[in-house]
């Protein structure tokens, strides 16, 4: 090779290597940008996730406080002597003033004696025993 050609050849090799270096540097820069963008997106996703969790916990805490306040109000009403939501009816003679007064008293009176209750219980026991006697014996005898 001639010296001019050789120098031209060297120059072309140098520029090619420079171009390759420039290309590789540019690809590295682009890759860095892409990685940085991906990392930023990932960080944004993580931040939004933690913000969501934080808002959920705050809402849950507020709801618990509201329920505690409401139950405290109900407890104060029932324990404080105020009237609660339960109404116990109390009848007065005036409530029945428009009813007919010429009615006869009922023929049967309910007594508070336990004799009748014991008789009923005895009759029930007897009927149960009869039913047991009529039933099949499923116990195996050896």
UniProtKB/Swiss-Prot annotation:
Subcellular location: Nucleus
Keyword entries, A-Z: Coiled coil, Nucleus
Coiled-coil region list: 110-141
Intervals of motif Nuclear localization signal: 60-64
Protein's GO biological process: defense response to bacterium; negative regulation of DNA-templated transcription; regulation of systemic acquired resistance
GO cellular component: nucleus
Entry's induction text: By salicylic acid (SA) and BTH.
Region Disordered, annotated ranges: 63-86, 108-142
Region (Involved in NPR1/NIM1 interaction): 47-53
Pfam families assigned to the protein according to its UniProt record, in alphabetical order: NPR1_interact
Chief localisation class: nucleus
Classification via InterPro entries: NPR1/NH1-interacting
Biased amino acid composition, Basic and acidic residues: 111-121
Similarity comment: family membership: Belongs to the NPR1-interactor family.
Subunit field text: Interacts with NPR1 C-terminal region.
Protein name: Protein NIM1-INTERACTING 1
Species name: Arabidopsis thaliana
